[in-house]
Amino acid sequence: MGGELPYFVVINEQGPAWDEKRSMRDQKGWTEHAVFMDALADEHFAILGGPLKYSKHRAMLVLSAPNEGVLRKRLAEDPWMRTGVLRTLEVYPWEVLIGKLT
């Protein structure tokens, strides 16, 4: 990886404000959440991401950050995190051994 920042795998799931009667894109604050995530991708902070097929809404992200503290602080700025639509379930440091993310 050279001088690149480490990678992390993050699993997020629906929070207490998630409305079970609505689809993901119909949740309150979807546009603000999408704009926030697009900005993280433009900054190369978010490398990959998207929903997982579970009964409860879960999403997986591959992020690049100097450390877990910085990562959690940035994710806490997500409008969906601030309003309880989404919450972080797990964070794992990740070493890429197969393939390339660049």
Give short role names for the model-derived ranges:
Residues 1-102:
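Conserved, structured core segments of small domains
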